[in-house]
């Protein structure tokens, strides 16, 4: 095959073009001298306003964002008045949590400001009255007031829409309160308003907290953020106080209140030290983070609350994933072991019966798992060693062993296929034959001289390289190149789709993952079809069938049962049970094919053109007179063979006895296991050397 003539496949080029065209690109603000000067002046003015302000003397830009309805103030005060419980709070609240939210109705609910566009997805979610959410809380420890980030993923009640909101702010340690806001805009104070979010409610005489006590601390934090924005304005020439996004959506504040752990600080510190610096010391289990919250958008006039939402600390979740991946290392090693056991049987008669698609699906599954663990390793720092180990070990069978086995299967099955049809005779070849006949006539003494006059002169073209038939080796190379191209193209498409599914609503993400899992774990279906087409039932060894079926269930069952904090959907026990039953069904079909024949479930009229030789005919003791003496002795092991007793041949006992012996077309009787073991390496009769049909 001339590889210089190879051109990229059309689907590959199309996919790359679509990816480049539709890949999200960040909107970069324009930079010029006027915009840079305007941005710097705006940030300096904001810095001066916050620095010279007091708790009671609120800047106009900030006060505009603090116009809250009565219901918001009352809900905030009720949130801060919740009991915090015994013990101390977590030293760091970085965690992952899931829970349910409910809207907070009030008279002006949903009245959007004139200059704000209500995001369609957010509006649909809020109008559903309630739903689920997942959130990541990040805390950056620094003195008495720690910086926080709160990433909130809102979902409606049927999980078909999702809206992402990111808040930044501060944690006030003495009162177990988190205060945050979305980004600053020209019409929204954002994080600059945080020092006044603890102001007294105008509708309540006795406030739950004294905001003046924590105002200096929060004011300094706001000044630090403004200084950072000022440096960015001097570098980039852009400030959120001057320029805003093309479409202004709902800006919002978040109020969070966390509960104590029931443990003292020394115990909490010991638990964290044991995680980051393991010494083998027995410690208590780290308590979960409990948070209640209120989210309010003054631009869109919407608010919702959530109560007692809990989730594990990040290092607890990371430790759980590390244990999972460490155990999965032994699972992958076991898969490699059973695969190598299977690859020992590489005789052409055995390889001919294997399904190419079954091995290809398992190789693709291993490659996808390796990419998945490598991607997860980029997020979880502590899991580097186990995650990379799993990725490497998953690539070992996919790249080294399975692909080599695929090449062997392809070569053997191609060699048993009929040769390609001959090329049709072209004009050049017919002209060549005419010229040859004319030349022979010229050499003949009896040929008429007029023949030379009437014969037209034709040009004899030399044989072209493309006209030469391809050898078997060239056909194998061509087919293998096509297989590799399709294999890696499918892996690329699935990986890109999986990447984009991370931003889909939970229900769509779950359906995508479920479809991917059930499709990938149908790898025995091609082998069942191969058995039916070839009329054979002895394919993979049962060690490999059972080992691959059981070991490969570990990862998908973990996804269905224990991935709420990672993939976002609650445990799906029904789907986990369905996957186990689906895998069990495939194995049972292979077992019954091995016992009752590969076409046991199909009528014989479908295969009249390709009948299958029956190695298990009914042979009774009375029929032995037709054979030679000692015909019921196996020639391989020299042990007697149990035959069907005289009587009915339809009872289950007689049918099972028939499966214990095999009669060849040359009328030689063997034990089933003896002949099958012989046929793993040879397809001839041990006695007379006649060819034996596949089992």
From Swiss-Prot:
Taken from the UniProt record, the cysteine pairs bridged by disulfide bonds within this chain are none
> Tell me, how does this one assemble?
Component of the DSC E3 ubiquitin ligase complex composed of dsc1, dsc2, dsc3 and dsc4.
Q: Which GO terms describe its molecular function?
A: ubiquitin protein ligase activity; zinc ion binding
Q: What does this protein do?
A: Catalytic component of the DSC E3 ubiquitin ligase complex which is required for the sre1 transcriptional activator proteolytic cleavage to release the soluble transcription factor from the membrane in low oxygen or sterol conditions. The complex also plays an important role in the multivesicular body (MVB) pathway and functions in a post-endoplasmic reticulum pathway for protein degradation.
- Lumenal side, ranges: 26-319, 375-382, 508-509, 562-572
Quickly give the catalysed reaction.
S-ubiquitinyl-[E2 ubiquitin-conjugating enzyme]-L-cysteine + [acceptor protein]-L-lysine = [E2 ubiquitin-conjugating enzyme]-L-cysteine + N(6)-ubiquitinyl-[acceptor protein]-L-lysine
**Originating gene:** dsc1
Q: Which Pfam families match?
A: DUF2921 (PF11145), zf-rbx1 (PF12678)
> Which portions of the chain have biased composition (kind: Low complexity)?
427-454
Q: Which UniProt keywords apply?
A: Endoplasmic reticulum, Golgi apparatus, Membrane, Metal-binding, Signal, Transferase, Transmembrane, Transmembrane helix, Ubl conjugation pathway, Zinc, Zinc-finger
Q: Name one GO cellular component term.
A: endoplasmic reticulum membrane
Membrane topology per the record?
Answer: Multi-pass membrane protein
Q: Name one GO biological process term.
A: SREBP signaling pathway
Query: Which EC class does it fall in?
Result: transferase
How far does the signal peptide extend, from start to end residue? Answer: 1-25
Q: Where are the zinc fingers (RING-type)?
A: 634-689
CDD domains recorded: RING-H2_TUL1-like (cd23117)
Native organism: Schizosaccharomyces pombe (strain 972 / ATCC 24843) (Fission yeast)
Q: What is this protein called?
A: DSC E3 ubiquitin ligase complex subunit 1
